[in-house]
């Protein structure tokens, strides 16, 4: 059954004019249904030029002398070049580039005092000062034994090591 709308005053043009702003007109330049799909960027356009690279912030004053001499050479080789003629300082780096992979490699000596301080500093950043105190108390005996080269037992709670190849035939 078809719907019929009866108009009270009989003038259909006036009723259409009152609702006309709610409909799109045919004479508008912008046609929503016939728009072309968005074009991808041209292959020659360099997308990285659109992003701004912010400079690396300076480290806090407490981080100034944490790099050992072998690590310093690696850090300088990874450092961005300053084109203004200013010299580069290792203190400008907030952290050694490469993270733990570089620190654990042959480049950085794990027995170096500055390397151990760097580990303690990172531990303080993530776990608080109580964890760093535990780390210092654990590292001190090990470093003393390494430097002396003696075979003194380090702690009572450490189990004795068993030989890897046990040839017991019982």
Curated annotation (Swiss-Prot):
Sites bearing Phosphoserine, chain numbering: 60, 68
Post-translational modification note: Rapidly degraded via the ubiquitin-proteasome pathway.
Effect seen on changing residue 60 to A: Loss of phosphorylation
Record carries keyword rRNA-binding: no
Principal cellular location given in the protein's record: nucleus
Keyword line: Nucleus, Phosphoprotein
GO cellular component, one term: spindle
Localization, UniProt: Nucleus
Cited Pfam families: Myc_N (PF01056)
Tissues in which the UniProt entry reports expression: Highly expressed in epididymis. Also expressed in hypothalamus, pituitary, uterus and ovary. Low expression in testis. Not detected in heart.
GO molecular function: DNA-binding transcription factor activity; molecular adaptor activity
Role, per record: Seems to act as an inhibitor of cellular proliferation.
Protein name according to UniProt: Protein B-Myc
């Amino acid at each position: 059954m078809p719907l019929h709308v009866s108009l009270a005053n009989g003038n259909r043009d006036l009723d259409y004019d009152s609702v006309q702003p709610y409909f799109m007109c045919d004479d508008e330049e912008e046609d929503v249904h016939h728009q072309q799909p968005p074009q991808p960027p041209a292959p020659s356009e360099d997308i990285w030029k659109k992003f701004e690279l912010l400079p690396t912030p300076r480290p806090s004053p407490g981080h100034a002398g944490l790099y050992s001499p072998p690590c310093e050479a690696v850090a300088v080789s990874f450092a961005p070049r300053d084109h203004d003629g200013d010299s580069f300082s290792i203190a400008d780096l907030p952290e050694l580039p490469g993270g733990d992979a570089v620190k654990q490699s042959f480049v950085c000596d794990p027995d170096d005092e500055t390397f151990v301080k760097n580990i303690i500093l990172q531990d303080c950043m993530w776990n608080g000062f109580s964890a760093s105190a535990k780390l210092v108390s654990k590292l001190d005996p090990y470093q003393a034994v390494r430097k002396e080269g003696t075979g003194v037992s380090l702690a009572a709670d450490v189990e004795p090591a068993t030989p890897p190849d046990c040839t017991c035939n019982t």
